Regions:
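Walker A (P-loop) phosphate-binding loop of P-loop NTPases
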Residues: 241
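Hydrophobic positions on the alpha1 helix immediately C-terminal to the Walker A/P-loop
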Residues: 247, 251
Length: 659
């Protein structure tokens, strides 16, 4: 593909991204108008009412306000570093309706009761005329960056204040900016990579003897060497449980033998946290731009803010910043001496900031951030020889170009047979926005790709179906875990169809129920059976053994409404009380990158037409069925699901295992 053609392709990407931006913004607007605060609270998108804590200036001299969640503390929330938020108040009428709705919810055990009973008309919800940005979240405590002039609006409010997620304009604008830069690039490394990534021209390689890594398996060792040989691009394709992170950490370590510093990015904060933690465990000096999602002292110590505040010059800088703020508040005496003093203080503050940042960045070997975080002003003007992008198969191409503009070569790692990027616009999806940079390069530059071929997570029979269906049978199971299980003579995979299960006989089976655009679908009978089957399996294992060996469980459903209903059922069933810390309940997306000893999946869909909605996204199901180490239990109506060839093959595979 010529230079003109690569530019045309990226211009098309920009048009598709614009469609997605408009679709997501419109969907957010409609959701905000249609959904009451009570439903947003239950979805984890809002906290209300807040307890407002202290305000302070952070290391970037931004005003930060501490707020605390006071209700629904058992609800998993969606607030994390970098997300935009808006504060609001409710009228007395709105507060009264929330109270009534919560009472109704407790009575009928319905996860949508709040949503059905709380009106969200404009007269009841009063949004404050500014936005904030989440800086830090730890359980029910959140720190939000807010405009200093609006702090009193929150702190002195006579009525309770709440906070909810707002539409994320920043991420889109950052991606649009990245595309504009790469389209405009001429005669530089970015222009070279742009043209290379849209052509079949072979990527360039170094030539030197392969290195040995006896602690890695053969495909992992090959992947590390391919990364070291790559002048332009290398791709690590890591199916579930194959040690992708282990391989990347080794490759980063070896790269740092040749380069002074590398940039490591991922689509999500959680993935950045994970690889950063593994690098820290190997003794690498990591500087984390942004705050971690999982708060622990080890990782907090590697964040930019903590490093900045721990610097010996920070107390002096803090005192100067305070003096500047106090000087600005003076209403009298703003003469020439005032301006001279202000300029001296500003100059000294800038000098100290530069010195502190130079030392912090000079000491770090790895700079870690999300893809959007790579546009942070702290990185402005910084160049890297190599950028590593993990989760590359979950990131829009435009997002990958954000860190790419800072580097000479790129290492992509991920699995395009697992979760794809989320695209809400049907037109954008049809136009190809969902096809990632990694997926495209796998197609046109297969010699740059290394498939990791040995998995260390699952019983061989759990992995076999996924290996055959998605990876051409190339992924094998490590001998040491090939036949591990919880119980002797246990079948590692089972499928129960609610209407065909003897103990239910289908008599109390209600099938699927549609509960609104934002909640999706729910199947109460299947949810009850899911927990019944889990309880039966726990009884087979034995309570004491589960507690002693910390046997953990993941309960997965593709539908958020079913997840919420399952959480409620577990919290109300006394049998599971001793095991609460061992049981996680979440959507498929929420379990990406995780694993459990036991996984039980509630499929939800149950109709005569064989309609399965987004269960047709087989990459999502690949994630679901590959989370289990030793036991996988599937609950789903076979009459509905097996009309689709994938589920028919999966069901037949499981039946063959049963003999």
């Amino acid at each position: 593909m010529s230079e003109v053609s690569s530019i045309q392709a990226l211009q098309q990407q920009r048009l598709l991204l614009q469609l997605e931006y408009q679709a997501e913004k419109e969907a957010f607007r409609k959701q905000t108008e249609a959904m009451g605060i009570g439903r947003k609270i239950k979805r984890g998108d809002a906290w209300y009412p807040l307890r407002v804590g202290k305000g302070f200036y952070n290391s970037l001299n931004q005003y930060a306000l501490e707020v605390f969640r006071t209700t629904d503390t058992d609800t998993e929330h969606n607030f994390e570093f970098g997300k935009p938020v808006v504060f609001f108040r409710l009228s007395a009428k709105g507060n009264q309706k929330i109270a009534v709705a919560k009472n109704n919810q407790n009575k009928d055990n319905n996860p949508t009761a709040t949503a059905q009973n709380v009106d969200s008309s404009a007269t009841e919800v009063q949004y404050m005329k500014f936005t904030g940005t989440v800086s830090y979240v730890d359980g029910d405590r959140m720190v939000v960056i807010v405009p200093e002039g609006h702090v009193l609006d929150i702190q002195s409010s006579e009525t309770p204040v709440g906070v909810q997620l707002s539409f994320d304009e920043t991420s889109y604008q950052t991606m649009f900016d990245a595309l504009a830069r790469v389209i405009a690039a001429k005669g530089n490394r970015m222009a070279y990579l742009r043209n290379l990534f849209y052509s079949t021209t072979p990527a360039e390689r170094f030539s030197f003897e392969a290195m040995r890594f006896p602690w890695l398996n053969a495909s992992q060792e090959k992947a590390v060497n391919e990364i070291l040989w790559a002048k332009d691009v290398a791709i690590v394709h890591g199916p579930p449980g194959t040690g992708k992170t282990t391989t990347l950490v080794e490759a980063i370590n070896e790269t740092l033998m040749r380069e002074s510093q590398v940039l490591v990015c991922a689509q999500s904060n959680m993935a950045v946290d994970w690889i950063s933690e593994k690098l820290v465990d190997r003794g690498v000096n990591v500087l984390r731009i942004g705050n971690p999602t999982r708060v622990n002292d080890k990782m907090l110590g590697f964040t930019y803010e903590r490093r900045f505040e721990a610097h010996a010059d920070y107390p002096q800088l803090w005192a100067i910043r305070k003096a500047i703020r106090e000087l600005r508040q003076q209403k009298k005496g703003r003469d020439e001496r005032f301006h001279q003093k202000m300029e001296r203080l500003k100059s000294r503050a800038a000098e100290l900031e530069i010195r502190i940042n130079t030392e912090i960045f000079g000491e770090a070997r790895v700079i870690a951030s999300t893809l959007v975080g790579a546009a942070h002003r702290l990185l402005e003007g910084r160049r890297f020889e190599t950028v590593f992008i993990d989760e590359a198969a979950q990131a829009l191409e435009a997002a990958c170009w954000i860190p790419l503009r800072r580097a000479s070569r790129v290492i992509l790692a991920g699995d395009h047979c697992q979760l794809p990027p989320t695209v809400k616009s049907i037109a954008a999806l049809k136009g190809g926005l969902g096809k990632t940079l990694m997926e495209r390069l796998v197609d046109i530059k297969p010699t740059c790709v290394t498939l990791l071929q040995t998995q260390y997570r699952m019983h061989e029979q759990i992995m076999r179906f996924s290996s055959d269906y998605f990876y051409g049978g190339k992924v094998e199971t490590a001998p040491q875990i090939k036949y591990r299980g919880i119980l002797d003579y246990d079948i590692p995979i089972e499928w129960y169809s609610p209407k065909e299960t003897p103990e239910t006989d289908g008599s109390d089976h209600t099938g699927e129920t549609f509960v609104g655009d934002t909640y999706g679908r729910i199947n109460k009978g299947e949810a009850q059976l899911t927990l019944d089957k889990l309880q039966q399996y726990f009884n087979k294992i034995g309570k004491q053994r589960i507690l002693d060996e910390r046997i953990d469980v993941g309960v997965i459903s593709p539908y958020r409404a079913q997840v919420q209903y399952l959480r409620q059922l577990i919290s109300k069933r006394d049998f599971f009380k001793p095991f609460r810390k061992l049981i996680s309940v979440n959507t498929v997306d929420g379990f990406q990158g995780q694993e459990r000893d036991i996984i039980i999946i509630s499929m939800v869909r149950d109709n005569e037409q064989g309609q399965i909605g987004f269960l047709r996204d087989l990459r999502r199901m690949n994630v679901a069925i590959t989370r289990a180490r030793m036991k996988l239990i599937i609950l789903g109506n076979t009459a509905t699901l097996t009309k689709h060839p994938f589920y028919r093959q999966l069901y037949e595979y499981i039946q063959e295992l049963k003999g």
